[in-house]
């Protein structure tokens, strides 16, 4: 079966979210023949069966959905205005905007959240390039810690950030800035600054970037009341609380760490 769903198709930049088809103009400009592209289906649909040589038995494939969209579904963000944010290497915030597309005036992305019964539910999305990757940098490059799990103990040992801040633009900045030329800045350093202060600045920077994303959403007329979070970074209790404080929003942390797999299972189970 040569097929995909609308959420994955929308990631190719070849998909027209208005017509729910491959964009003819883009394909023509890039000289891509439409017949080589997969059929676009609902997120819950018949995608064929697995081959016995791989899975032992032939099992039906009834759910296909993009990574971040699957996490949104797994977090049960089915209502308009519901938000999930995944904090892994990067961070990805997705807000369900319902059956109507909202085109951001504040540099957020409009995408497909999921598609069922030939009807799309849309979302606004913002991407943070460096979240947990900042902790990896501190561990692997700067040798400030040995394990990522040490960060919670480190930040809790400090009464404040001592005026030390990090702009983690190691690979540019994502939404809402979209500046590929931006580079990282560590400011407020004094002779008293040590590894602990830098670690705290790294952890705090993800919350501050999240604040910028949520402010963009508010300017687009959407004010979330809660945020559902998952990913490796939110295992840090201090970060989860700091995130809530910075955003001034209640943060709900999923007990299920595999929300992406759960969302895909939800889609499969609808068939």
Language model regions located:
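Active-site core segments that coordinate phosphate-bearing ligands/cofactors
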Residues: 1-4, 8, 13-24, 28-29, ...
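Short acidic capping loops at alpha-helix termini that bridge into adjacent secondary structure
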Residues: 34-36, 225-226
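Gly/charged, well-structured mid-domain segments that form the phosphate/adenylate-handling core
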Residues: 39-46
């Amino acid at each position: 079966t040569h097929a995909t769903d609308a959420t994955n198709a929308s990631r190719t930049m070849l998909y027209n979210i208005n017509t729910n088809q491959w964009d003819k103009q883009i394909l023509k400009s890039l000289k891509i023949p439409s017949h080589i592209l997969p059929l676009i289906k609902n997120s819950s649909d018949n995608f064929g069966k697995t081959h016995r040589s791989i899975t032992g038995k032939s099992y039906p494939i009834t759910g296909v959905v993009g990574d971040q969209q699957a996490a949104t579904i797994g977090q049960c963000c089915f209502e308009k205005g519901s938000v999930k944010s995944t904090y892994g290497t990067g961070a990805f915030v997705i807000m369900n905007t319902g059956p109507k597309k909202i085109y951001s005036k504040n540099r957020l992305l409009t995408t497909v959240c999921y598609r069922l019964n030939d009807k799309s539910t849309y979302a606004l999305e913002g991407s943070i390039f460096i979240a947990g990757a900042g902790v990896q940098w501190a561990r692997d490059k700067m040798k400030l810690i040995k394990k990522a799990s040490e960060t919670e103990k480190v930040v809790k040992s400090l009464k404040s950030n001592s005026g030390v801040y990090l702009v983690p633009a190691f690979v540019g900045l994502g939404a809402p800035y979209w500046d590929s030329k931006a580079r990282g800045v560590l400011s407020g350093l004094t002779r008293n600054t040590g590894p602990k202060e830098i670690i705290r600045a790294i952890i705090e920077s993800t919350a501050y970037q999240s604040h910028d994303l949520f402010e963009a959403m508010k300017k687009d007329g959407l004010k979330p009341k809660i945020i559902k979070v998952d990913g490796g970074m939110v295992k840090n209790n201090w970060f989860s609380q700091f995130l809530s404080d910075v955003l001034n929003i209640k943060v709900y942390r999923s007990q299920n760490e595999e929300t992406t797999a759960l969302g895909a299972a939800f889609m499969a189970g609808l068939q």
